[in-house]
Amino acid sequence: MSNLKQLRTRIKSVKSTQKITKAMQLVSASKLTKIKNQIAHSNFYVEAISKMMSTVLSADIYDFPIEAQKFFNTETNKANLLIVMTSERGLCRTFNYMIIKQVKSDIETLKSKGEKIKLIIIGKKGYEALKKPYESYIDSYFELPKNHDENLMLQIKQKIMALVANLEVSNCTIYFNRFKNAMTQSMTKQQILPIEKYHDDSKIEEANYEYEGENLIQNLINLYVNSQINYALLQNRASEEGSRMTAMENATNNAHDIINKLVLKLNRSRQAIITMELIEIIAGSEAV
């Protein structure tokens, strides 16, 4: 009888866990739908800014102030800025592992070359993984809010702009997961600085923008950095929720299989007990 009690307790426990994983799956699915809508709206903005930046730079008809020139600087004696985007929570398969693995590999490569390194880490999981081995390289750490927040994007942008303005870094690379679908996310390493500058006479007429302000280039740089950070944050958030939704769906299905096996085992145990009792009753009646 004690065995039956243990089985019933285990079934109850697994059912309780199944309810939790199912709820987490539904929450992630809801968040993913919302983020995918945000990505759809932001993609046009990112493409437009990138095209405008490319056109203006290749036309080469606007003045480049000293501050703006720092974003095109390819000096190698400055630090490499690595922006690492992870998550606040786990339960999302290899989402964080792949990013952290790539970042560690690149840090070791840069160290072997004697290059300077600065880290900006977004997400608790990334900070926990990188704090102990690379604490001296960490410049900033940002916690992820529960929902996509433009304030975080602005804080990261301001930090990047300050580091470049102070001539502390010469290039900037963002590490994030690019969203393909709920089942598939790809670890992405995207360099956003220095900005490539080249000349193309065919772009001169196309680049004649009517602009009122001190400097078109500097404002375009601000918009460009903003758009790249926002794009990476949205892609990473969608990848996180997609990965967690898939993980929780698998967990829910696994719980269902375990429950079925436990119920079958419970029924067989009960049947064995009943059979044993019947045998004892029959044997007792024959003895009488």
From Swiss-Prot:
Signal peptide interval: none
InterPro entries for this protein: ATP_synth_F1_ATPase_gsu (IPR035968), ATP_synth_F1_gsu (IPR000131)
Name of this chain's protein: ATP synthase gamma chain
Subunit structure: F-type ATPases have 2 components, CF(1) - the catalytic core - and CF(0) - the membrane proton channel. CF(1) has five subunits: alpha(3), beta(3), gamma(1), delta(1), epsilon(1). CF(0) has three main subunits: a, b and c.
NCBIfam families in UniProt: ATPsyn_F1gamma
Keyword Cytoplasm tagged: no
Gene Ontology molecular function terms on file: ATP binding; proton-transporting ATP synthase activity, rotational mechanism
Cell compartments where the protein resides: Cell inner membrane
Species the sequence originates in: Rickettsia bellii (strain OSU 85-389)
Membrane topology value: Peripheral membrane protein
Family recorded in the similarity comment: Belongs to the ATPase gamma chain family.
Physiological role: Produces ATP from ADP in the presence of a proton gradient across the membrane. The gamma chain is believed to be important in regulating ATPase activity and the flow of protons through the CF(0) complex.
Key words of the record: ATP synthesis, Cell inner membrane, Cell membrane, CF(1), Hydrogen ion transport, Ion transport, Membrane, Transport
GO cellular component terms given for this protein: plasma membrane; proton-transporting ATP synthase complex
One BP term from GO: proton motive force-driven plasma membrane ATP synthesis
Coiled coil ranges: none
Pfam families: ATP-synt
